[in-house]
């Protein structure tokens, strides 16, 4: 997430996704799917231009739509089948809503006046929008009193020196930038075949004093039934969140246990709406709908060894 024209100009969302299979520990990953997107976001989180590596028909019909819940309906309307196929392209497009919502936080690290802008004051309709802003929340009081302070943590590079190919090539970002990074690792338990999921999610910004700081970070560990592909267990870990109330969201995730994985994109929104859940944990849970596709790719690769 960058602003090539500088402060208060068009936001660019440049996304990259990769599906890859590793057959054995130490093997190089086998890339089985990729996608890239570039989206221009104007005022009111409106899509002004959009391209993708696939050249998918229907993309241009998204121009004029806003990032937010209604964008998901537009994705289904203009790009039918992408959600059901769990494509890397869909994962990137689905993130337009969340990315356009949090992108501006990057400027709070560089411009002291940013947090006090009128557009950032808590409106009456923000109460109850998520578990952090539930009625009576201290986070609401902090924001109303003058912008409050987001709790952040300094974070190192995402790249693990012991597994340098664990991520696709990450873009070199300018100092004033925001990045949303997610991973979904899937394997079968060698003893009973249970599907094991380890997923991570991080929103971070460039910082003039600390290199990079994160404002949201979750890790999800889950299991699923190998025959029915239903969610058996889910254990979210809230590592970095902006307000004291936010970590309580981890206690809400159990309501989606028993859901078929490919139905998580809709079930999460139905059961964890507004103050029942956390917007960012919901994003992490919804992305697990891609697991059946990843599992099929894993099985196909292992079958050809």
Locations of regions flagged by a protein language model:
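Long, positively charged binding patches that form subdomain-scale interaction surfaces
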Residues: 138-214
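Active-site- and interface-proximal helix/loop "cap" or "latch" segments in soluble metabolic
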Residues: 1-157, 203-305
């Amino acid at each position: 997430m960058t602003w090539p024209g500088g402060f208060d100009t068009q936001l660019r969302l440049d996304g990259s996704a990769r599906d890859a299979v590793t057959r054995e520990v130490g093997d190089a990953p086998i890339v089985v799917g990729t996608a890239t997107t570039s989206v221009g976001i104007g005022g009111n989180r409106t899509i002004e231009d959009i391209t993708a590596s696939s050249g998918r028909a229907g993309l241009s019909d998204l121009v004029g739509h806003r990032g937010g819940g209604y964008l998901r309906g537009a994705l289904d309307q203009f790009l039918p089948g992408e959600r059901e196929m769990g494509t890397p392209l869909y994962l990137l497009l689905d993130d337009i809503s969340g990315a356009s919502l949090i992108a501006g936080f990057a400027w709070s690290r560089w411009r002291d006046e940013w947090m006090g802008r009128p557009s950032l004051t808590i409106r009456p309709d923000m109460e109850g929008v998520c578990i952090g802003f539930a009625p009576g929340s201290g986070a609401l009081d902090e924001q109303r009193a003058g912008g409050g302070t987001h709790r952040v943590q300094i974070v190192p590079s995402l790249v693990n020196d012991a597994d340098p190919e664990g991520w696709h090539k990450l873009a070199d970002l300018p100092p004033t930038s925001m990045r949303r990074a997610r991973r979904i690792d899937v394997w079968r338990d060698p003893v009973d075949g249970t599907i094991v999921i380890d997923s991570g999610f991080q929103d971070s910004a460039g910082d003039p004093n600390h290199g990079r700081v994160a404002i949201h970070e979750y890790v999800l560990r889950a299991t699923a039934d190998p025959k029915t592909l239903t969610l058996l267990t889910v254990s979210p870990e809230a590592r970095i969140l902006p307000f004291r109330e936010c970590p309580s969201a981890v206690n809400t995730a159990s309501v989606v246990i028993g859901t078929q994985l490919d139905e998580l994109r809709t079930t999460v929104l139905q059961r964890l709406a507004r103050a029942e859940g956390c917007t960012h944990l919901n994003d992490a849970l919804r992305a697990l709908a891609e697991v059946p596709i990843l599992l099929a790719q894993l099985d196909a690769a292992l079958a050809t060894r």
